[in-house]
């Protein structure tokens, strides 16, 4: 039988009140608090906190404030930058390629809930992974919804709400996001 953590990461219905998951969220919040209250010149400390949070050494640059659920489901490529107020709800994996930039206030969600009200009211939750390719720029206050894959060389316009997969080499914008230009 799978643990609640295994079910969560696999995108199956799970119970977020599980003791292990509650402990993991608390750990992430403590690390994020330290990160968000560190000084800009404390580069080594910030990199160590991110390594502890993500479970991998990264040269990512993330402006405080940053928020996530667990951290261990976030996988960042080389040369990653996130500006102020980035949120990543990582109940399922979030994979971001090389040379990606997130403008202020970008939110990436893997967390979702059952559509059926009986299932939703039972406390069960689920998630869907998000994958973002290489050389992607996501504009300010854009939202990437659960289950979305964004291709390489994509620009997501400010304020876009991405609800469906995005192919390579395009600019998308709007709510819901649609292709507005091919690159």
UniProtKB/Swiss-Prot annotation:
A Pfam family recorded for this sequence: Mac
pH profile of the protein: Optimum pH is 7.8.
SUPFAM superfamilies the record matches: Trimeric LpxA-like enzymes
PROSITE patterns per the UniProt record, alphabetical: HEXAPEP_TRANSFERASES
Site (Transition state stabilizer): 83
Domain of life where this protein originates: Bacteria
One Gene Ontology term of the molecular function aspect: identical protein binding
Keyword Transferase appears in the UniProt entry: yes
EC number: 2.3.1.79
Top-level EC class as recorded in UniProt: transferase
Keyword terms: Acyltransferase, Repeat, Transferase
One cellular component (GO) term of this entry: protein-containing complex
NCBIfam families named in the record: PRK10092.1
Family that this chain belongs to: Belongs to the transferase hexapeptide repeat family.
Protein name: Maltose O-acetyltransferase
């Amino acid at each position: 039988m799978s643990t609640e953590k295994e079910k969560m990461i696999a995108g199956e219905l799970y119970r977020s009140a599980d003791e292990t998951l509650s402990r993991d969220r608390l750990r992430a919040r403590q690390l994020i608090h330290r990160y968000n209250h560190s000084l800009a010149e404390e580069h080594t400390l910030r990199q160590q906190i991110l390594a502890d949070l993500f479970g991998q050494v990264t040269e990512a640059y993330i402006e405080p404030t940053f928020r996530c659920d667990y951290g261990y489901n976030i996988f960042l490529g080389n040369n990653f930058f996130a500006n102020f107020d980035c949120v990543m709800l990582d109940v399922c994996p979030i994979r971001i390629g090389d040379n990606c930039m997130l403008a202020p206030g970008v939110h990436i969600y893997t967390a979702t809930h059952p559509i059926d009200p009986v299932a939703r009211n039972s406390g069960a939750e689920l998630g869907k992974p998000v994958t973002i390719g290489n050389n992607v720029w996501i504009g300010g206050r854009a939202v990437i919804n659960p289950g979305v894959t964004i291709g390489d060389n994509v620009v997501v316009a400010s304020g876009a709400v991405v609800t469906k997969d995005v192919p390579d080499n395009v600019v998308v914008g709007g709510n819901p996001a649609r292709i507005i230009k091919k690159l």
